[in-house]
Amino acid sequence: MAHIGNGNGNGNGFANGNGNGNGAAGLCLHPDPLNWRAAADALTGSHLDEVRRMAAEFRKPVVRLEGASLSISQVAAVAAGREVKVELSEEARGRVKASSDWVMDSMGKGTDSYGVTTGFGATSHRRTKEGGALQKELIRFLNAGIFGAGPEDGQTLPPTTTRAAMLVRVNTLLQGYSGIRFEILEAISSLLNHNVTPILPLRGTISSSGDLVPLSYIAGVLIGRPNSKSIGPDGTYVDATEAFRLAGISGGFFELQPKEGLAMVNGTAVGSGLASMVLFEANIIAVLAEVISAIFCEVMQGKPEFTDHLTHKLKHHPGQIEAAAIMEHILAGSSYMKMAAKIHEQDPLQKPKQDRYALRTSPQWLGPLIEVIRTSTKSIEREINSVNDNPLIDVSRNKAIHGGNFQGTPIGVSMDNTRLVLAAIGKLMFAQISELVNDFYNNGLPSNLSGGRNPSLDYGFKGAEIAMASYCSELQFLANPVTNHVQSAEQHNQDVNSLGLISARKTAEAVEILKLMSSTFLVALCQAVDLRHLEENLKAAVKNTVSQVAKRVLTMGVNGELHPSRFCEKDLIKVIDREYVFAYADDPCSATYPLMQKLRGVLVEHALVNGDKEKEMGTSIFQKITAFEEELKATLPKEVEGVRVAFDNGTNVIPNRISECRSYPLYKFVREELGAGYLTGEKVVSPGEEFNKVFVAMNQWKLIDPLLECLSDWNGAPLPIC
């Protein structure tokens, strides 16, 4: 009976009920012969739960290969060189041996099979009985890559990509349809487990008859080609002999049997391996984009109404519904949202009714992107668990089947689509940070998020915004498709080809750029959080100071009688509540700044309604203005500086609201674990130094835990519609 599914929802499987491991007929008899149901079932549940599973799998110490259950997170873990051991299922040994034996038997019987007795591609009309020599020549002529003088020339694939390719190729060959010895697969696994990585060329594959050229260099190490090189555990280049010694492979180099060279090179493993790594990161970045959009709402004092479930339920798209629900969860109970609600109650008719698109439509923007990432992820997981060489050996029917599973179109299409997604996420981040640094839009934060005392000598995130524009422009360029640039190749035999690896490489570039953007934006959001904290303390100090000065100066007349100006205090406090503190904080008593102008305006307005009392020195409010302002000038700058000093020392009276928010784990990670601090022009440290800390942490997978911690108590459903 056929095995349906693999735990990843890929719907891959193989039958093993016939003794030789190849129950091909059974593949067509199960209840989902077209695999559509399996593909649909793979998308059940939330995207966040899927990312949680990926993160858990990524940390497991062992990856056990049996041919049909490999996940992109396992590929990413092995590729990253983590302490992960690769094991091969002993159950696969029998079916792998059966297909290998079939090739040798058919060769002995004189059966004519492509790549076993024939030439390759457009020259398959040629025939030979020297099956081993044919495989050796295959590897030789495919070693057509260019490496330059060394790694500094940038013409080699990253070792992580090669490790991913090795893992995927072993997995696909374990299904027993390829005619290769189990011992060769064990040797590749030994190279992986001992961190010995063949050097592959960066370019030279069209991912049509598989990734022929790069995969031939893995085969070159296994057969001991003199031009083959590997990177040892210590990072040095070694030849094939030393590679075998370091990997503990005994018995010497392999003498290829018929079909074995073709089995190694005629597959999509390099493209699908890199695609797996790319999608592992893309899935995490998608969740990050949802969470930081919610943090953006917090620091912008946005209106959380945009996450209301009814809005998104009526749109029907699951990605949008989930994105909104995640943001709703972050914002529900947020201390920032409670404060923002009070602010919005002040003069509501004088403020915009709704937020700009970068905030208000972020679920609608991100939702379809998440759906595409999920679809691409499942497509690649099907690919890395597929049999993708040619011909396929069907032992049960005693035949070699000539087809084209080596065509890497699922990779090219998935990577083109993923790159569009990454560009769109980057565009949203750029729109959000552009609002955040602009004091015309950011609801009272200082221009450029400048954190210092003197805005004329502190330009904050101005350089960062320029860098973000650069990143975003390059990212949008990379969004252009690769797969429409096909060239007919190999004497017009490979006249359509997927360009899967090229597309995956471009998508890997896009991931790196989006991580640069994410790192920059995350530090900017933390800066905004701290500025809101400073703002709240400054405003409290200003209100207290103005109130105290008003009581001292405006309450009593010269002879101790109650003065009409005592009624001004309430309106003076309203001015402070309505005025952005950073509009005057660098010089709070400046006559050119709005605070002093509007405080004076309050006194003038009260004086104008004071009537005949203004004619008397003892009851004139006008006569109090100078005394009030002089007292304020003597007191307020000291109080403002005191708040600044307390902020620098971490001793402010009002604590930082972020500690009461579900977004706190990300803030804490940046500020405390990474030590990326509050930026000001008064410090020597540059913005890029702090951005780099976050970028390095992302590359080291350290952001995953604090990101998921922000959503640890989400139950996977939107809040009820009440």
Curated annotation (Swiss-Prot):
Q: Where is the active site?
A: 114
Q: In which tissues is it expressed?
A: At the reproductive stage, mostly expressed in leaves and florets, and, to a lower extent, in bulbus and stems.
What is catalysed by this protein? L-tyrosine = (E)-4-coumarate + NH4(+); L-phenylalanine = (E)-cinnamate + NH4(+)
| Cross-link 5-imidazolinone (Ser-Gly) residue location(s) | 208-210
* CDD domains registered for this protein in UniProt: PAL-HAL
The UniProt note on temperature reads: Optimum temperature is 50 degrees Celsius.
The catalytic activity of this protein is classed by the Enzyme Commission as: 4.3.1.25
Binding-site positions, (E)-cinnamate: 266, 354, 360, 390, 462, 490, 493
Among Pfam families, the record links this protein to:
Lyase_aromatic (PF00221)
| UniProt keywords, alphabetically | Cytoplasm, Lyase, Phenylalanine catabolism, Phenylpropanoid metabolism
Q: Which residues carry this modification: 2,3-didehydroalanine (Ser)?
A: 209
Q: What is this protein called?
A: Phenylalanine/tyrosine ammonia-lyase 1
Species of provenance? Fritillaria unibracteata (Sichuan fritillary)
